[in-house]
Amino acid sequence: MTLLALGINHKTAPVSLRERVSFSPDKLDQALDSLLAQPMVQGGVVLSTCNRTELYLSVEERDDLQEALIRWLCDYHNLNEDDLRNSLYWHQDNDAVSHLMRVASGLDSLVLGEPQILGQVKKAFADSQKGHMKASELERMFQKSFSVAKRVRTETDIGASAVSVAFAACTLARQIFESLSTVTVLLVGAGETIELVARHLREHKVQKMIIANRTRERAQILADEVGAEVIALSDIDERLREADIIISSTASPLPIIGKGMVERALKSRRNQPMLLVDIAVPRDVEPEVGKLANAYLYSVDDLQSIISHNLAQRKAAAVEAETIVAQETSEFMAWLRAQSASETIREYRSQAEHVRDELTAKALAALEQGGDAQAIMQDLAWKLTNRLIHAPTKSLQQAARDGDNERLNILRDSLGLE
């Protein structure tokens, strides 16, 4: 059994590739079923966010393992293998465990130490448990990563300042507009990122917020909290002209805001500027919108420059966090090795018990037939001894023939010989 982590993220792939490799929530079960149908895959978790798509797997080791999994990923998303290979990373066993712990702790995030990723990892794990988690080692790896992430946040200052993609989006808005108290903001979506954006905007006393979402009920809960108006996605075209700032983050597979829609809004606004921040993957806003005069479009990747200013205060904490991850990875791998030994011990004990039961049954049968008890017991003891020491004896003889003193010493130690 081998643990794997493979995927792409904001550091290895542009948004144009990430959106093609992402797994939409409504097709996740189908993807997991397809993944587990691969003969070498024993269990799997798919983590797909705006900044990363990763597969965490428990697999049987084989020569073409990497090729087979890359082929599956490309076939599933209809990708050219060369396009993916240049951006794909591959971590195995110790490195896979360390990678997941770093991801869950926010150490591999676009915003160092951001807390949302832990919730996303937990959701990915929960989704995989709906009939897709078939490997206890993989499950234990995720549970351990959750506790490590909690330890990192408790024992370091990695989360001391409120820095996130949502915070960066609001920072961008405040840099462009001197005051948010005179602007109207349209939020598209009502997920966790938009919730954070809405709360940041409320803290900065934005004049008006409008929330457009596919389901009104979810949006209304957020709107009641932050004092916003709720509209349907179908109303965006008509209401877009009211918005000075548009921040969008949905799970839609297709763009929600098109170039023509923005052109009409700008015309109604008499070309008064609009800021559009698209933090969705796949993108919610057609890239061509950025070519329009007075439409200033920023994607997730564009937020990197803003976010970089907030990293300095977290770097010292990150060093501490990396130490924790290294320690916890080492402990987990020791547990994993012990599990492997436990399985060997169980097999060895089962084998010995089978020999014992077989020979005992024969001895009891001989006694029932009136055989000499002392002779039967001596025969049982002799046969049991020979059967149990047969395999170790052959190993000792082979080690001696090979001149392998190290193996001889290990065998002597394991047999309790001084």
UniProtKB/Swiss-Prot annotation:
Keyword set includes NADP: yes
- Which pathway features in its UniProt record? Porphyrin-containing compound metabolism; protoporphyrin-IX biosynthesis; 5-aminolevulinate from L-glutamyl-tRNA(Glu): step 1/2
Q: Which reaction does it catalyse?
A: (S)-4-amino-5-oxopentanoate + tRNA(Glu) + NADP(+) = L-glutamyl-tRNA(Glu) + NADPH + H(+)
The entry marks the following residues as binding NADP(+), namely 189-194
Instruction: Fetch the InterPro entries from UniProt.
Output: 4pyrrol_synth_GluRdtase, 4pyrrol_synth_GluRdtase_dimer, 4pyrrol_synth_GluRdtase_N, GluRdtase_CS, GluRdtase_dimer_dom_sf, GluRdtase_N_sf, NAD(P)-bd_dom_sf, Shikm_DH/Glu-tRNA_Rdtase
The cross-references to SUPFAM superfamilies, in alphabetical order and at most eight, read:
Glutamyl tRNA-reductase catalytic, N-terminal domain, Glutamyl tRNA-reductase dimerization domain, NAD(P)-binding Rossmann-fold domains
Supply any other comment. Answer: During catalysis, the active site Cys acts as a nucleophile attacking the alpha-carbonyl group of tRNA-bound glutamate with the formation of a thioester intermediate between enzyme and glutamate, and the concomitant release of tRNA(Glu). The thioester intermediate is finally reduced by direct hydride transfer from NADPH, to form the product GSA.
Assembly and partners are described as:
Homodimer.
Name the record gives this protein = Glutamyl-tRNA reductase
User: What organism, scientifically named, is this protein from?
Assistant: Escherichia coli (strain SMS-3-5 / SECEC)
